[in-house]
Amino acid sequence: MARALVLLSVVLVSLLVNQGRASDNQRLFNNAVIRVQHLHQLAAKMINDFEDSLLPEERRQLSKIFPLSFCNSDYIEAPTGKDETQKSSMLKLLRISFRLIESWEYPSQTLSGTVSNSLTAGNPNQITEKLADLKMGINVLIKGSLDGQPNIDDNDSLPLPFEDFYLTMGENNLRESFRLLACFKKDMHKVETYLRVANCRRSLDSNCTL
């Protein structure tokens, strides 16, 4: 009888611990999604403010340029389209999100100076700090998904895309600034999508449609 009670206690403790971990993991996922949503909204606001400051002809010219241009993230292997994203594993989406955020650590230092924006006034390093916090959170989620297994991934050994990519391309400051803002918005949208699907992947019964 005593042994049965001890066994029951162990099982109950194990269940409580697992429930606690699941709750913490969900909280981390929710925080990560909220953080990248804010960055995506900030990116949209910054590029809108930038476009509003342009002359009509400048706006037309830049709108033709960007669809034909490349972003730094194009060198990072990632799902293309909704179907491939939905078929990707949670861990794969987390790893890609991590690399995308990491690739902006250096370029983000010039983002705040690209456009005068009330959202970044008083704290020019706000975007870089938010990216660092999000990167840390995603890294914790990756480690939690591995559950003690070594973090082995082919992309981990690859160098990040060129740090000065946005500074060396373009014919003038106007184009470089537009490219920087447009690519930042594009990549934050990617990460938001990947984290939403990854969060959905935690529940096998969920319909993770985009």
Swiss-Prot record:
SUPFAM superfamilies membership: 4-helical cytokines
InterPro entries: 4_helix_cytokine-like_core, Somatotropin, Somatotropin/Prolactin, Somatotropin_CS
Domain of life: Eukaryota
Full protein name: Somatotropin-2
Coiled-coil region list: none
PROSITE patterns, alphabetized: SOMATOTROPIN_1, SOMATOTROPIN_2
Keyword DNA-binding recorded: no
GO BP annotations listed: animal organ development; growth hormone receptor signaling pathway; positive regulation of growth; positive regulation of receptor signaling pathway via JAK-STAT; response to nutrient levels
Family statement: Belongs to the somatotropin/prolactin family.
